[in-house]
Amino acid sequence: MAKTLGLHILADLYGVDADKIDRVEDIRELLEGAVKYANLTKISSHYYQFQPHGATGVVLLAESHISIHTWPEHGLATVDVYTCGDPSKAYRAMDYIITQLNPKRIDKQVHERGIVEEESNQSEAEKLRSILLQV
C-alpha cells in the first residue's frame, strides 16, 4: 500500500492590496502568524526587502517550509506551503495566508510528494490470505 510523505500547496494570489505585501515587516508577521495558526514547528526564517517594491520570506520548518515572494506593483503574491506529517497543517497555514491577504483571485495547486510503498510486517502468506478474503 502506498502512502504520501508530504503535501505541497502552491498558490498564486492576484489582486492583493499592495500595502499588505510591500513591506518585509508585514511579510514576516504574515508567515510567523501562519506557522502559529497551523501549529507548525519553526526552525529558522529569513526575509528580504526588495527595492523599490516587494519582499520575500521563507520559514524553515521541522515539517518542511513556507515561502512567499511578492510583487506589490502587480498585486501578486506567490506562496508555497510544504509539510510532511499531518496534511491539515498545510491547509491551515495556506488558509491563514489567503484570509489575511484577501486576494481577488487564487490559482492553487496541491501536490502529494514522496509517494512510497508502506512497509508491512505481514508475511507473504498473510498478505495472500487477506487478498483472498476480500474476493
From Swiss-Prot:
GO terms for molecular function: adenosylmethionine decarboxylase activity. GO terms for biological process: spermidine biosynthetic process. The keyword Aminoacyl-tRNA synthetase does not apply. Is synthesized initially as an inactive proenzyme. Formation of the active enzyme involves a self-maturation process in which the active site pyruvoyl group is generated from an internal serine residue via an autocatalytic post-translational modification. Two non-identical subunits are generated from the proenzyme in this reaction, and the pyruvate is formed at the N-terminus of the alpha chain, which is derived from the carboxyl end of the proenzyme. The active site is at S64 (schiff-base intermediate with substrate), H69 (proton acceptor), C84 (proton donor). Binds 1 pyruvoyl group covalently per subunit. Keywords: Autocatalytic cleavage, Decarboxylase, Lyase, Polyamine biosynthesis, Pyruvate, S-adenosyl-L-methionine, Schiff base, Spermidine biosynthesis, Zymogen. Its EC number is 4.1.1.50. The modification Pyruvic acid (Ser) is found at S64. The record marks E63, S64 as: Cleavage (non-hydrolytic). Its cofactor is pyruvate. InterPro entries: AdoMetDC_fam_prok (IPR003826), S-AdoMet_deCO2ase_core (IPR016067), S-AdoMet_deCOase_pro-enz (IPR017716). Pathway: Amine and polyamine biosynthesis; S-adenosylmethioninamine biosynthesis; S-adenosylmethioninamine from S-adenosyl-L-methionine: step 1/1. It catalyses: S-adenosyl-L-methionine + H(+) = S-adenosyl 3-(methylsulfanyl)propylamine + CO2. One of its GO terms (cellular component) is cytosol. Heterotetramer of two alpha and two beta chains arranged as a dimer of alpha/beta heterodimers. Belongs to the prokaryotic AdoMetDC family. Type 1 subfamily. Catalyzes the decarboxylation of S-adenosylmethionine to S-adenosylmethioninamine (dcAdoMet), the propylamine donor required for the synthesis of the polyamines spermine and spermidine from the diamine putrescine. NCBIfam families: SAM_DCase_Bsu. This is S-adenosylmethionine decarboxylase proenzyme.
